[in-house]
Amino acid sequence: MGGFIANPAFQFDNHSIVELTHQSRFAGMVNSDYVGFRKEIRKNVPVHFSILYEGIGKIPDTRSMLLDWGADGVFGTQDSGEGNGIIDEGERLNVDSIKYFSQHIFGLHGAFNKAWHQWQVGIGTKLLLHFIDDHHAIGIGLDLGFFRHFNGFNFGFVLRNIPSSGILWENGTIEGTLPNIDLGFNVPINMINYGLEFNPILSIRVNPYNRSLDSDIGFGTMSIDTVIGMECKYDNNLAVRIGRNPLGTMVGGIGISWKRISMDYGFLSEDSNSGLGNHHLITLGFSPDWLVEKVSR
């Protein structure tokens, strides 16, 4: 169900599955959780909800560490170097002045889609609550997704943050996010005699306003980044996945699924130059009816 965040136009065969996901990043410094489920707001009008949380604890606040007393080592004399915010000769840091704070982000995503001609069209709405130290903010956003099966392959694209998204802080500051476009291609290759299915995937992200040094292709302010991946499924129960994210880092995963329960594990290797540790993601999907049946025995 997390696919509805990627493209609200996606449709899945089994709509009764609840998904629970936990992700640990940077060797456990950042932890994220996800819950996804389907709810009919009225007959034959399902909305796919996603609840997300991300927390970062013990973020050091070093702003008061510097003993910025200047060359004479005495506060209040206004000598050379005092109060300039730079560690000058004779000054030092006071480790006892380190303070710690945390960051918490809560998100709610709702996706709704309908058939339109030969396309599946979906709308995704986003609500974000952001808390960092004693500051807080609220954000909203809108995505528009399209998906279609062609002869032998699948194609989808998403217009993100249209017309734009924004986060409003309690002091009136607004963080704006300009629109971008994601395109995805998938060509299923079936080897029925062997029970195998291969799913090569190509995703292209076009951002007209946010070119960076890490961009695969850049034109002026525009950046184009690519994601490639391959999924191999055996007997529709066992899946092995490998790919490359927009930063060029290799990712991989394995999944096991049955009719009413599934388990997945994802892994993102550490950038050899960062020293920040690996990322791990674990997902459990289950049917609520199956869970009630097991508990009531």
Annotate each predicted stretch with a short phrase.
Residues M1-R297:
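Subset of outer-membrane beta-barrel
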